[in-house]
Amino acid sequence: MDNRTLLNWSSILKNEKKKYYFINIINHLFFERQKKMIFPPKGKVFNAFVHTQLYDIKVVILGQDPYYKINQAHGLAFSVENIVKFIPSSLKNIQKEIISDLGQNRSFSHGCLTKWALQGVFLLNSVLTVEAGKPGSHYKLGWERFTNKVISIINEYCKGVVFLLWGSYAQKKICLIDRTRHYILLAPHPSPLSAYRGFFGCRHFSKTNKILKQQNKSPINWFF
């Protein structure tokens, strides 16, 4: 059997999705969507897994939960739909750091990170859904059990992945990552509250590409 068949998300998460806690999450969302607005839309909750297969992962960026305003969240951490004109502050700060880090006089016309995902950047939120207007509303739904399992799978089946852990919440996942197999870069969260405490100047984008090149992997084109 082709190794890519063995290492695709569909096959490797098949048993996890049969577990009671996961079925309970899906059922809960089904009933919540009958009376509430939930983000991302139903068909986009698992976009991170659609755009970046397990065998393609070079980089993992961990977020918390999705954006809670309409037409923003589409299943990729920190990313917004390319039709969105207002770029969230954290993403705007990420863009600023990319420009500063890479020393290129370029600008961004949108905030959609799909091109990152297609290059092997796995954009995973720890919690995959949120109720409109209520940040953190699905923290107790059980998503973290699932996404912790996903991180553990990446840790086990991949090698030389660069984990970008921004902020204390993401950095709690360090215990799931084997530092002898992977690389971990730490920085404060890019939100306006903490970006000036060390996210700006962290140079994670150039550092990541340097690590990838050392492994004979193609670097990421961070401009989108």
Curated annotation (Swiss-Prot):
The keyword Hydrolase applies. Keywords: Cytoplasm, DNA damage, DNA repair, Hydrolase. The active site is at residue 65. GO terms for molecular function: uracil DNA N-glycosylase activity. It catalyses: Hydrolyzes single-stranded DNA or mismatched double-stranded DNA and polynucleotides, releasing free uracil. InterPro entries: UDG_fam1, Ura-DNA_Glyclase_AS, Uracil-DNA_glycosylase-like, Uracil-DNA_glycosylase-like_sf. Its EC number is 3.2.2.27. It is found in: Cytoplasm. Pfam families: UDG (PF03167). GO terms for cellular component: cytoplasm. One of its GO terms (biological process) is base-excision repair, AP site formation via deaminated base removal. Excises uracil residues from the DNA which can arise as a result of misincorporation of dUMP residues by DNA polymerase or due to deamination of cytosine. NCBIfam families: PRK05254.1-1, PRK05254.1-2, PRK05254.1-5, ung. Belongs to the uracil-DNA glycosylase (UDG) superfamily. UNG family. This is Uracil-DNA glycosylase. It comes from Buchnera aphidicola subsp. Baizongia pistaciae (strain Bp).
